[in-house]
Design a protein with these regions (language model features):
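Short, intrinsically disordered/low-complexity patches at protein termini
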Residues: 89-93, 106-108
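Charged low-complexity stretches with an acidic bias
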Residues: 64-88
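Generic ordered-secondary-structure signal
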Residues: 40, 52-53, 63, 108
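N-terminal start-of-chain detector that recognizes signal peptides
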Residues: 29, 59-61
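Short inter-helical turns and helix N-cap capping residues of alpha-solenoid HEAT/ARM repeat scaffolds
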Residues: 62-63, 93-94
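Hydrophobic transmembrane helix segments
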Residues: 17-23
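Structural detector for internal amphipathic alpha-helices that build alpha-solenoid repeat scaffolds
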Residues: 2-4, 11-15, 26-47, 68-77, ...
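Amphipathic alpha-helical scaffolding segments comprising HEAT/armadillo-like alpha-solenoid repeats
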Residues: 3-11, 23, 46-58, 79-91, ...
Length: 113
């Protein structure tokens, strides 16, 4: 997916984070992998412009997958906010999204993210 500007990057990020969450829950690996690629591409575009702050409002999005991906993208930029968002998801979701948030925190602590 070709991204032309920050607005498109943010839209791409959010849309694909939602898709990725759906695919995580329903097991659609092919579509999930494509959405993952698009999310990473959007993050790279946002990073190139040094505009990570446009992701901060997504830490409070209604969609847990959007919140997890926003936190992932912000872990090295705004660590306290990102970690707080992930910990809240771990506390409030006992399903796959809570597990994903917990694994993201664990991998960050290990230095793998």
């Amino acid at each position: 997916m070709k991204i032309k500007n920050l607005e498109e990057a943010l839209i791409c990020f959010k849309e694909n984070a939602i898709i990725h969450g759906e695919c995580t829950q329903n097991g659609d690996n092919k579509r999930g992998n494509k959405s993952h690629k698009n999310i990473i591409n959007a993050i790279k575009n946002i990073s190139a412009e040094h505009k990570y702050e446009i992701l901060e409002p997504l830490l409070e999005d209604n969609n847990l997958s959007v919140r997890i991906w926003a936190a992932y993208a912000l872990l090295h930029v705004n660590t306290p906010k990102a970690v707080k968002a992930l910990k809240e998801i771990v506390k409030t979701d006992s399903g796959i999204m809570g597990f994903n948030a917990e694994m993201t925190l664990d991998e960050f602590k290990k230095g793998n993210i």
